[in-house]
Amino acid sequence: MSGQSSGGFDVVIVGGGLMGSLSALRLADAGRRVLVLEKAVPGAEASSAAAGILAGQSESKSDGPLFDISVESRERYVALAAELRERVGIDVGFRRCGVIEVAETEQALDELERTFAWQRTKGHRVERIEASALRSIEPQLNPGFAGAIALPDDGQVDPPTLVTAIAQAAERAGATFRAGTTVRSVLVENGVARGVEVEDGRIDAGHVVIAAGAWSSLVQGATIASSAVKPARGQIVELSLRTPPFKSVVFGRGGYAVPRPDGRVLCGSTLEFVGFQKDVTVGGLAKILGTITGLAPSLADAKVNRTWSNFRPFSSDGAALVGDAGIANLTLATGHHRSGILLAPATAERVRAHVIDGRTDANSPWNPSRRTSS
């Protein structure tokens, strides 16, 4: 059993976003004394800026372990949402509203169905919607679409509310959050992580977890190569209507629309490698708004509530880094790119298992050994 210290904290988690906060909750529930260090405000970065799509099926174009993890994590949200309502009285906006991906031509619709057909053989729902039915189901969509493929078990959550609820639950369970704290390095002595160095000294702990998102590779000693996890800027536009224009999350060529029950619609997104430049750009907005009005021309009359951008932790091989970092008592939980909200429940369970029991699946596509460096 690892992750216990005779004094101070058993676990220090670097990063107070969704990954760090949910890992803190699970470890605190297991009796660990947990400190979460966040350079800004917990949840202020990519976690709260995400659209919150639970695309366990719709983002999976091929079979394999990553698909299985995605569906597992999506299904964990059923219990997680109920747990948070009970623990802190907050509805995190979990809705199994489904995702539909539209096709512009019959040929594209056939190809889209072939892309997802393998999921049916694994027992998952995949539905083909012809043009006439699509106009009845989602009348606001462009009437020129040839149809769509529906993944009715995918859904959404509201990320800012989710992060707030999890942080509150973690604090009630005994975890400590410290905002405005930049971690410079992991303190390693004789091949064992002993804590972290911050701007005003050191913090000792029995175990260190790196969950700093796009900033993870900047923590010295975290064993994460700069090429393994890097920032990918994503811009989002939030529209406002009197009523939701769609029942489901809608994917189209080059973008998506996420309808909230209160009439807000989150539209995205861009993928830009510009370092940590957080600007919202004319080009980015033009791309998003062009895509969204192509999906539903009536949205051209919607009010623009706000725009923002943030940085997803992009992993160049498409898989996160979760588990054993190759140094004793050091765990990684980063590199989830745009699936961080979806994959947080599965990640937190694996972090808990590694910290408490030392377990990391050597065959997992998330095993950090493929991408870490000393």
Name each region found by the language model.
Residues 159, 296-374:
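C-terminal catalytic lobe of FAD-dependent flavoproteins
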Residues 19, 42, 215:
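Conserved Rossmann-like nucleotide-cofactor binding loop
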Residues 25-30, 39, 52-54, 90-95, ...:
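Active-site substrate-recognition segment that forms the wall
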Residues 90-103, 115-116, 127-173, 270-274, ...:
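Helix-loop-beta segment of a Rossmann-like dinucleotide-binding subdomain
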Residues 9-35:
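N-terminal Rossmann-like FAD-binding beta1-loop-alpha1 element of flavoenzymes
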Residues 52-133, 137, 291-293:
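Dinucleotide-binding Rossmann-like beta1-alpha1 core, especially the glycine-rich loop
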Residues 149-207:
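Helical element adjacent to the flavin cofactor pocket in flavoenzyme catalytic cores
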